[in-house]
Amino acid sequence: MIKKTLPVLILLALSGSFSTAVAADKKETQNFYYPETLDLTPLRLHSPESNPWGADFDYATRFQQLDMEALKKDIKDLLTTSQDWWPADYGHYGPFFIRMAWHGAGTYRTYDGRGGASGGQQRFEPLNSWPDNVNLDKARRLLWPVKKKYGSSISWGDLMVLTGNVALESMGFKTLGFAGGREDDWESDLVYWGPDNKPLADNRDKNGKLQKPLAATQMGLIYVNPEGPGGKPDPLASAKDIREAFSRMAMDDEETVALIAGGHTFGKAHGAASPEKCIGAGPDGAPVEEQGLGWKNKCGTGNGKYTITSGLEGAWSTSPTQFTMQYLKNLYKYEWELHKSPAGAYQWKPKKAANIVQDAHDPSVLHPLMMFTTDIALKVDPEYKKITTRFLNDPKAFEQAFARAWFKLTHRDMGPAARYLGNEVPAESFIWQDPLPAADYTMIDGKDIKSLKEQVMDLGIPASELIKTAWASASTFRVTDYRGGNNGARIRLQPEINWEVNEPEKLKKVLASLTSLQREFNKKQSDGKKVSLADLIVLSGNAAIEDAARKAGVELEIPFTPGRTDASQEQTDVASFSVLEPTADGFRNYYSKSRSHISPVESLIDKASQLDLTVPEMTALLGGLRVMDINTNNSSLGVFTDTPGVLDNKFFVNLLDMSTRWSKADKEDTYNGFDRKTGALKWKASSVDLIFSSNPELRAVAEVYASDDARNKFIHDFVKSWNKVMNSDRFDLNNK
């Protein structure tokens, strides 16, 4: 009977979400039996073979051909067409769809760029069965007729966000706009959502700190527990949780208040009865005949007035399908007292509360207003109070703040505006989009490219430093939210210029020389032609690699397309870019134990995953970068060659050479390789290096590149992978 003492959200979770049952004959991955085995699955996710539309499907083109006005009309009609199997509150699905869009986008977090609306991950486990997403399976099912009609022209990710926008607009709110471009995923993402897979487990460590890279305070929540931290109705403590969670999702205090106040202007919460007695398993544990729907409610009709979602019950406003100032007015108009919902959840009602809110399904029945503990937090926290009172006295400022915050919430994970599609994209650019200046000059041509590469190699800069600079600049890219990369040449700006991994003093000298060459070249042009530093950084790295290949007897030319521009410091939010600082980069044999939350080898896989690399691409890149000697601080770890600076396959040849015996060194994460016969020290390595001979899957690839007939193949594979990283952020070439 211990369940009776637990917060309602936990009861909802225990009712069936997060099913962990394993069938007796279920085939498990290697990691199930050997949990210490390195998991390479992140490098094999979302392959083209998973996409039923086919590898050649061009979503951007399909979206651009979409009749957006017809689609929006169909959505608007759907909003007020109540279905008997899931009746609309107040005859309008708008608030329901706002919650769907919000909870799809709200999983985004800044530390690793994971989560967000892109991919439509709310359709898959575990998100589809999170306690905070109870009944959103019905929202998506209500949308299915629209998705069915427009098919490949709009992804689930785009449709859910657009539906949230249309819902707001249909209830009298003017949104800032909408951008398409969220391609759908076809399988669950592999994301670390918390240290414990139990629903609503605390995501804080033993010292009470919210673990990185997490943003939600409890497993299975989008942000925070609406009843208060751990289900305890403490508004001030709740404010602390809100501030931490929202800041990790890229929202400041004003944006946080605008989102909560704006969102809670609409709709109601649902807690008609005890979830323990009424609610079945979530989608992940529901029987097959439920067809992917979960949380079957056996009480009453199971829907309408009997609906159970969060366990809290009631509305914040007497006009829950209209955009009004009532939320803020009610927050300050009444003195609020704690009570419990019919489901037993902690919530707040006005003292001497009058029944003034119409029932969502029977207009003849009236209810009192209510607030969550998280709502009261906006009134009692000193900083939030300043903002809520300002918004209360300036409705226009509130409306504008909500519009901007909503647009940011639903588009933050899409990356730069260059990826946006459609005719509803706002003309205004925002600092959180990492804006870039337009190129107002003529691009360099093939003759210029050849000349600049020759001039770069004559600067006297070691080739390893040119390669290292290009890698440091481009490898900040994250495919999770399309941030970072070389475009903008932000490596010369704060904060990147002073990142430890970039060896600031050396980096500044390289950049000074390249900047001087850039200025000289541009000054000599008479036809409006210019080269950006961003282009020159990549070009110089290419030139150095071509030289390294030439030393190995291989002539090649790395493809190069100019078009990158140089951002200004004013276009670069230092705090926002600080989260991109690597805590580890296995490609440079760099690892900061004090700032990393996973091992060096796991960090390598995570980095490769962020760069959208496959297992062979990661392997080729690391082996090539090692022999070209680009390790941070000129570390000798993994430089398995007697000819550093020559692009060849010696890293793999020497790594797999059985004449070397490896043992741990006294220094942490360092290994010594001794000659088996003489005992002489031959090489030094990190765990990141040795994993390519110890892990069976990585060794299999390493053996290919170590083979006598694979020398040229390795060089060309390295160049192809290098070029992929250098162009990861070139959305003008390939709108991902």
From Swiss-Prot:
<dbReference type="GO" id="GO:0046872">
    <property type="term" value="F:metal ion binding"/>
</dbReference>
<keyword id="KW-0560">Oxidoreductase</keyword>
<keyword id="KW-0376">Hydrogen peroxide</keyword>
<keyword id="KW-0479">Metal-binding</keyword>
<keyword id="KW-0575">Peroxidase</keyword>
<dbReference type="InterPro" id="IPR010255">
    <property type="entry name" value="Haem_peroxidase_sf"/>
</dbReference>
<dbReference type="GO" id="GO:0004096">
    <property type="term" value="F:catalase activity"/>
</dbReference>
<feature type="cross-link" description="Tryptophyl-tyrosyl-methioninium (Tyr-Met) (with W-102)">
    <location>
        <begin position="223"/>
        <end position="249"/>
    </location>
</feature>
<dbReference type="GO" id="GO:0020037">
    <property type="term" value="F:heme binding"/>
</dbReference>
<feature type="cross-link" description="Tryptophyl-tyrosyl-methioninium (Trp-Tyr) (with M-249)">
    <location>
        <begin position="102"/>
        <end position="223"/>
    </location>
</feature>
<dbReference type="InterPro" id="IPR000763">
    <property type="entry name" value="Catalase_peroxidase"/>
</dbReference>
<comment type="similarity">
    <text>Belongs to the peroxidase family. Peroxidase/catalase subfamily.</text>
</comment>
<dbReference type="GO" id="GO:0042597">
    <property type="term" value="C:periplasmic space"/>
</dbReference>
<comment type="function">
    <text>Bifunctional enzyme with both catalase and broad-spectrum peroxidase activity.</text>
</comment>
<dbReference type="GO" id="GO:0005829">
    <property type="term" value="C:cytosol"/>
</dbReference>
<keyword id="KW-0614">Plasmid</keyword>
<keyword id="KW-0408">Iron</keyword>
<protein>
    <recommendedName>
        <fullName>Catalase-peroxidase 2</fullName>
        <ecNumber>1.11.1.21</ecNumber>
    </recommendedName>
</protein>
<dbReference type="InterPro" id="IPR019793">
    <property type="entry name" value="Peroxidases_heam-ligand_BS"/>
</dbReference>
<dbReference type="GO" id="GO:0070301">
    <property type="term" value="P:cellular response to hydrogen peroxide"/>
</dbReference>
<feature type="signal peptide">
    <location>
        <begin position="1"/>
        <end position="23"/>
    </location>
</feature>
<keyword id="KW-0732">Signal</keyword>
<dbReference type="Pfam" id="PF00141">
    <property type="entry name" value="peroxidase"/>
</dbReference>
<feature type="site" description="Transition state stabilizer">
    <location>
        <position position="99"/>
    </location>
</feature>
<dbReference type="GO" id="GO:0042744">
    <property type="term" value="P:hydrogen peroxide catabolic process"/>
</dbReference>
<comment type="subunit">
    <text>Homodimer or homotetramer.</text>
</comment>
<dbReference type="InterPro" id="IPR019794">
    <property type="entry name" value="Peroxidases_AS"/>
</dbReference>
<keyword id="KW-0574">Periplasm</keyword>
<keyword id="KW-0349">Heme</keyword>
<dbReference type="InterPro" id="IPR002016">
    <property type="entry name" value="Haem_peroxidase"/>
</dbReference>
<feature type="active site" description="Proton acceptor">
    <location>
        <position position="103"/>
    </location>
</feature>
<feature type="binding site" description="axial binding residue">
    <location>
        <position position="264"/>
    </location>
    <ligand>
        <name>heme b</name>
    </ligand>
</feature>
